[in-house]
Amino acid sequence: MASDNSQTQTRTKKPRKKRKTYSCGVCRKFKTRCDFEPLVGKCHRCNVLRLECSLTKEREEEILAAVESTSKSTLAPASLVSGQLPALAAANPVVANDAVVVAPVAATLSSRLNKLESSVGSLNSKLDLALMLLQGSNSAISNLKNLTSSKAGMGDRNATYDDDDDGDDDGHDHSDSDNFVNGIKLQEPPLKLISDIDERLFPTKAQSQQDILAKTQRPFVVARFNFLKYFNQHEQLCLDLSRDFLVKSHFWIIPGGIKEINRTYVEKHLFITSVFTIIAMGFDENNKYEKEQEQLYPLVERFLTNTLTMFEKLTDHDIEAILYCSMFNISRKSKRHRQLKFNSLVLCNFAVNSVLNIVDFHKIKERVLINEEYSALDLYHLRILNSLTACRLQYSIGSGNFTIQDDMLKEFNNLTAKFPQANFGDDIKISEINLGDIVNGIFLNFKAYFKGFSKRFRAETRGHADRNRDCLVIPELEYWLKNWDELLSKDGGGVLLFAYDFYYSMICRSFLTEFFEEEFQNDVVYFKCALKTMKRYCFSLLDGFLKLPPSLIKGAPTITLHQLVYACLTLCDFLHCFDVAERQQVLNLCTKIYWHLNTIGEKLNEATDNVGKIIKSLIDTSKRKAQVSGRLAVPRNTKRGSPSMTPGFQQSVQSSSALQGSKAGSPQSARSVNSQGSGADSLAAASFNMPDVAQFNSFEDFFQDFFDNLKPTTQSMFSTLQQQQQ
């Protein structure tokens, strides 16, 4: 019985409770002190001696808890460097070499290490950029930017954060929209601070009665006083002329502007009122306001020339006035000995810099894209900037001063499309800027562009029997035409197509004049295609101008009339390359332009004067060419693949540059082109006068009378197509 009880006690005896150990196996074996370090994952002794520690597995939960509790604080650079950085540096060799720490610990430490490396790399990049800026090395800065972007991309690919690490961010979430609007206008740039100090040391405030009197003699103050006096004497005239300008030119100027002004507006904005008035004086025929214009011009000239000294104090209306001075003539051609001709490109550049100085477009961009605020004042400032940008591009291209366009400025130009109150005119401005930017880009690298264009043209037309019928196709312009097709279909005035035709003809003419000896001299087919394309778009430009409503033409900017004259001049310079029928078309169309400008009230205008001289040059040039060769000999390819040009054709094409002098209205200037005509013929051409349009009821009567008064030898050049066969 006793034995049974003892067996039962043996079976029911509880197992001995295992004593909790706080030391690792190595420390227990050598009976040494064991201090466990959770962030390291080992005890102090094993860590120093680089031994495997049993506590790494036994206290896994404690290790993870310690890492997680310190993760948030370790993201701060100061705490990371001062506290946990040594621990991490000591832990990494163990993790890498011994592979003892389990996967969750390794992932956490790896994540934190990636964040640390990314932060340090960004800091190094910024320090390097600062050093490069101090050294002034542009190439190094460019390389550094590329290096920074590549490092940023690598950091993004290497960073593999767990879901538990979302709280480890620095709290700055940069979205794409934030990066798009992170530009600012500095509130305290260095030169502004220096200028403020200068104003404090040398105040502009008048201290004495003598200073007050001297201040009233400042040029801009005198100009304001004198124009206000002029306005008081001619108040109704100024108001009426300002209304005429705003009504007639509203299609070309800032969209959505005012149509009428009053005395209150005039007193606040004297400069722009004077510009309205003097431009409108040029719209009327027969020098109706010649006396008033002579009195007003010195006042406007003083306003305009003193804007440089008023740069910091210019208002948005002042800059708008400078815009109109660059778009329209404020001086009269007949008074050029006294009234200056201002450089429109210089005025545009100054106005663009001025508006960027007084308006914070970065704030406008932020309000539009982030806050979705669409104020009327912001739209007004953006419209001024867009009109200035379009005008500057037109004059840059027209004068051959091609410059790289600022990407930031392009972003500002596109902001008007975001406004719900934007209208059709705003879309036209954006389209004009886009077209000008495309053409400007072509001319910036014109030599390389032409070589690539010629190579593609020959590759596409090789083996085609009808190469002579092809017109050149400039893909960049065709892309623009397709991209803005919907807007062009709604453009009743055809203004955009007018600019499109001008740029097409300008590029083709530049091909012929700049690269004739390199390319066209040995490829007659290529030359004829370029010539045909140039003629096609010159004709399209002139036909489009004839279709414009008179109300648009009367208020058109000078650049538009310059484009018109350029088309006539181009046809004149290359007239000897056309056949008889084409010559007659050129003469007929240019004469119709002259008639149209006169009948819509543009008498005594610079465009009518130039077109009239060009028509006279057309006649004189054609007459001499007929006397030299009897008819124009069109060269042929002697053998496929090896085109050759006759000496007469080569000489006639090269002579087109000599005819540039004809645009000055002097037919004798073209006599250097092997002219065999008599002196009497030249004198007759020089003394030729265009008939008075007012004497005729229709263009047909005007042209017939004009044609009947030509010499018989000149008539025979344009009469019939059969003359070409003689």
Swiss-Prot record:
Matching SUPFAM superfamilies: Zn2/Cys6 DNA-binding domain
Main location: nucleus
CDD domains membership: GAL4
Superkingdom: Eukaryota
Keywords (A to Z) from UniProt: Activator, DNA-binding, Metal-binding, Nucleotide metabolism, Nucleus, Transcription, Transcription regulation, Zinc
Keyword Plastid: no
GO biological-process terms attached to the record: nitrogen catabolite activation of transcription from RNA polymerase II promoter; nucleotide metabolic process
Cellular component, GO annotation: nucleus
InterPro entries: Carb_Metab_Trans_Reg (IPR050797), Zn2-C6_fun-type_DNA-bd_sf (IPR036864), Zn2Cys6_DnaBD (IPR001138)
Polar residues: bias regions: 640-679
One Gene Ontology molecular-function label: DNA binding
Residue segments, region Disordered: 152-183, 629-681
Acidic residues bias spans: 161-170
Protein name: Uracil catabolism protein 2
Organism: Lachancea kluyveri
